[in-house]
A protein has these predicted regions:
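Nucleotide and nucleotide-moiety/phosphate-recognizing core
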Residues: 4-167, 172-191, 196-197
Length: 200
């Protein structure tokens, strides 16, 4: 453990935002992140796998538009503002998370990716500490994982302006702010649960 700490150096404090606001249409609109799935021998709700993998968060924020009482036992809950019809998409949830973030860095994770390796986020934090980049995004050597990212609070005005113009594409916003990719060799880690078969 000491050797690992020395290798990583001093990592910046961060808050964790788990995105749980989707409709889960392929899962009968059940609240996906609360559904149990077995990972590494542990059968627990997806969100609990995620929180466990992202160890060290100063604050845990959950973007959710339903089942908010269930989420409150795990962290602070933010919902899409009333001015947004339906669900505003992940960018709206990210903006609401940035508004209440208790640290200078916000780690963003989708609530349906329970296979993340323990402390997977250290690579993002280390890059932020070394280079001071405002937006870092995980890349699995195949494609950019747009919603597995580390954001500096300074990007909030840019994101708000982007959303107010009616834009909702995370990929497009990341391109406009010059996001930097951080490579991960493990591609299966970012697998997201979409239907009943994935739960087994």
């Amino acid at each position: 453990m000491q050797e690992e700490k020395e290798l990583l150096g001093d990592l910046p404090d961060f808050s964790l935002l788990v995105l749980c606001g989707g409709k889960a249409e392929r899962l009968s609109r059940r609240n996906k992140p609360l559904l149990p799935v077995r990972v590494n021998g542990h059968n627990r709700p997806m969100i609990d796998h995620i929180i466990n993998a992202c160890e060290g968060a100063i604050d845990i924020i959950i973007s959710a538009n339903s089942a908010t009482e269930a989420y409150k036992s795990r962290g602070r809950v933010v919902s899409d503002p009333l001015s947004v019809s339906g669900t505003g998409g992940p960018l709206v949830g990210i903006l609401e998370g940035l508004k209440i973030c208790a640290t200078h860095h916000l780690l963003v994770v989708p609530g349906d990716t329970p296979c993340l390796e323990k402390n997977w986020h250290h690579r993002l934090l280390k890059k932020a500490a070394e280079d001071g980049e405002r937006v870092l995004v995980a890349h699995d050597n195949y494609r950019r994982q747009n919603l597995h990212c580390l954001l500096n609070l300074d990007v909030a005005p840019s994101l708000e302006a982007f959303i107010l113009k009616g834009n909702r594409s995370a990929r497009h916003w990341l391109e406009t702010v010059g996001a930097i990719d951080v490579l991960y060799p493990q591609t299966d880690m970012f697998f997201n649960i979409n239907d009943e078969a994935d739960l087994k």
